């Protein structure tokens, strides 16, 4: 039932009527629209997208602002975007979207020679993300894979502007990183200037 202080459609009507219309105030104007009840079927495709986007969004927790890493990343973040949205877009461009992106990110992180991604990721506050209705076998992106995604994004930014990230560990190719490089990377994400 809509709440009113005057005839319906005037002043401040709010609420729904007959499961068909919704009255509300938007930007100071009284508005009416059809009632839409969103569906959440939790399909496999939806799970894959939520898993990848959710994990990449969570990875932002590892970055302290300001930090040395953040300052360099902000330099190449496109105007009108946050560094997080630029990172998500870039990582999807690197690994792919949906189930393809999840599988590629997990494979890249698992195939990396440094073995301390998980330990370091836990140390910077990252946690695994699991979505049970995503593609079977690819229902989790670990904290270490989230940290690896930021590292891959970093090297992509460095390729576009070599003057950025001109320090260790970024002078070593990501594929050649060892445990000390991963630890140094996490420190760069967290070091306040």
Description of each model-found segment:
Residues 75-193:
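Charged linear interaction tracts used for macromolecular binding and regulation
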Residues 1-118:
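Long, polar/Ser/Thr-enriched low-complexity segments
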């Amino acid at each position: 039932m809509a709440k009113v202080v005057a005839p319906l459609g005037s002043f401040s009507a709010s609420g729904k009527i007959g499961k068909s219309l919704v009255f509300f105030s938007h930007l100071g104007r009284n508005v009416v629209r059809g009632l839409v009840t969103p569906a959440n079927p939790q399909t496999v495709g939806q799970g894959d997208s939520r898993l990848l986007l959710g994990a990449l969004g969570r990875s932002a927790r590892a970055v302290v602002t300001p930090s040395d890493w953040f300052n360099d990343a902000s330099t190449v973040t496109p105007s009108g975007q946050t560094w997080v949205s630029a990172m998500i877009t870039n990582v999807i461009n690197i690994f792919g979207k949906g189930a393809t992106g999840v599988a590629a990110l997990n494979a890249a992180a698992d195939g990396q020679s440094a073995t301390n991604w998980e330990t370091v990721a836990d140390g910077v506050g990252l946690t695994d993300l699991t979505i049970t209705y995503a593609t079977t076998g690819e229902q989790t992106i670990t904290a270490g894979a989230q940290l690896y995604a930021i590292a891959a994004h970093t090297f992509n930014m460095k390729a576009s502007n070599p003057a950025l990230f001109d320090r260790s560990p970024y002078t070593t190719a990501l594929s050649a990183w060892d445990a000390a490089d991963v630890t140094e990377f996490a420190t760069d994400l967290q070091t306040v200037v």
